[in-house]
Amino acid sequence: RLENFPLENWWDDISVGLTGAFLCTKYYGTEISKNSDGGVIINISSDLGLIAPDQRLYEQTGMQKDEQPVKPVSYSVIKSGLIGFTRYLATYWPDRVRCNTLCPGGVDDGLPEKFVEKVARKIPQARLARPDEYQGALIFLLSDSSKYMNGATISIDGGRSVW
């Protein structure tokens, strides 16, 4: 819960999710920006970088409201931060490095069935993704077919973020 979320956890999450992306980009982006062909950076965000998590999805029966589990605040902050960071990068190396963000939705990879059913009701396609449904977008973003895309945010979430 937000009111009980330890500051140490916040810093740990931000360190991995945002500082890690910053450091990777700082060194990799600097190197590929020197190449005549440049390169591509794809930051992986989430549909929860575009929309707020519906905390009701995490509710469990028999628990008091102040004890209910929630999606940690740091997750959405990191994922939306990656979108902003990508937009910044698109203007920083615009002629050498293409920087885009992929925002996948949830993946049905063994989550509890009742949770999957609750989430699926929030998605126009009424299901979570299969693990192989993101690879086409990644291949496209890495290819010359997307050479004019820079600073874009691509959502692959079955329509969840349109609500």
Residue ranges of each PLM-predicted region?
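A hydrophobic alpha-helix adjacent to the NAD(P)-binding/active-site core of NAD(P)-dependent oxidoreductases
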Residues: 2-5, 13-14, 119
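Short, small/polar-rich loop/turn modules that mediate ligand/substrate recognition or access, typified
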Residues: 94-98, 149-151
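A conserved structural motif in NAD(P)-dependent oxidoreductases
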Residues: 123-134, 145
